[in-house]
UniProtKB/Swiss-Prot annotation:
Transferase in keyword set: yes
UniProt-recorded name of the protein: Methionyl-tRNA formyltransferase
Species of provenance: Haemophilus influenzae (strain ATCC 51907 / DSM 11121 / KW20 / Rd)
Superkingdom of origin organism: Bacteria
Family under the similarity heading: Belongs to the Fmt family.
Gene field: fmt
Keyword Kinase: no
Catalytic activity: L-methionyl-tRNA(fMet) + (6R)-10-formyltetrahydrofolate = N-formyl-L-methionyl-tRNA(fMet) + (6S)-5,6,7,8-tetrahydrofolate + H(+)
Length: 318
């Protein structure tokens, strides 16, 4: 088993977990690429990415170009003479000159079973779409968006209660060992590159705050999935009014689907210790855990103790 000289490119904590796995292996990380430091916190002080922090703790040279399109940055990377480059949630586009620079090209860790979800938010979109299974794909990168040949796939189930947070944590457990398995066997033929069937792909579009607004003209089943998919960000929400006509926005963390009732979508059907039940175009959405402005998430019952007037039975929410 040959030890490889690796360039690692990544930015968030998810990427740092993969870097740590490589550092624990027989392979050598000769350089780390990560996004430039960004202002964070109340003081807006520049903060290093989790990947940069880990690299510096291990005395690994760190490169932080704003782009890899310039010839100078490409020449600098090529001069490292790496065997392979591993890319995990890096955040920069890799031009062909970079993809071709390492002897064995560039590998990417992708948070879904390709080609099902290509793009920025595969974990969230798999829950949003009601998928029952997902996983991690290790692929050889090409110039397309998540279109490269697949080397290794590891599967996991999506539970009916799964949030993006819990699924992210599952994949963060699976992915690093899958990556090491590929690196250990990259040159011995254990993993045969498999072409993707582009006709089976969907684009996992980034989430937006606008999309997180609960739309009662969608089915209760879809809205319940949205609530789980949009947790931890941007968190599903809706608005209601008090008796004086003041609007109040509420975030929703947990809900349950109940059988359909023939009422206009958005109608408040009941509001008690069992939840706040709202009619949708198909099914009833029972809101169980909510958060009002300036408060911590709480049960529907606790919210109703102080805010029952917000949820008059028969009122139709926008």
């Amino acid at each position: 088993m040959k030890s490889l000289n690796i360039i690692f490119a990544g930015t968030p904590d998810f990427a740092a977990q993969h870097l740590q796995a490589i550092l624990n292996s027989q392979h050598n990380v000769i350089a780390v690429y990560t996004q430039p430091d960004k202002p964070a916190g109340r003081g807006k002080k520049l903060q290093a990415s989790p990947v940069k922090q880990l690299a510096e703790q291990n005395n690994i040279p760190v490169y932080q170009p704003k782009s890899l399109r310039k010839e100078e940055a490409q020449s600098e990377l090529k001069a490292l003479n790496a065997d392979v480059m591993v890319v995990v949630a890096y955040g920069l586009i890799l031009p062909k000159a970079v993809l071709d620079a390492p002897r064995l090209g560039c590998l990417n860790v992708h948070g879904s079973i390709l080609p099902r979800w290509r793009g920025a938010a595969p974990i969230q979109r798999s829950i949003w779409a009601g998928d029952v299974q997902t996983g991690v794909t290790i692929m050889q990168m090409d110039e397309g968006l998540d279109t490269g040949d697949m080397l290794h796939k590891v599967y996991c189930d999506i539970l009916p209660t799964e949030t993006s947070t819990s699924l992210y944590n599952k994949l963060a457990e699976l992915a690093p060992s899958a990556l090491i398995d590929v690196l250990d066997n990259l040159e011995n033929g254990k993993f045969i590159a498999e072409k993707q069937d582009g006709s089976q792909s969907n684009y996992a579009e980034k989430l937006s705050k606008e999309e997180a607004q609960l739309n009662w003209s969608l089915s209760a089943m879809q809205l319940e999935r949205n609530i789980r998919a949009f947790n931890p960000w941007p968190i599903a929400y809706f608005s209601t009014e008090d008796k004086d006509g003041n609007a109040h926005t509420l975030k929703v963390y947990q809900a349950k689907v109940l059988p359909h009732q023939d009422k206009p979508a958005g109608t408040i059907l009941s509001a008690d210790k069992n939840g706040i039940q709202i009619a949708t175009v198909d099914g009833v959405l029972n809101l169980l855990q909510l958060q009002s402005a300036g408060k911590k998430p709480m049960s529907a019952q606790d919210l109703l103790n102080g805010r029952a007037e917000w949820f008059t039975i028969g009122k139709v929410l926008a």
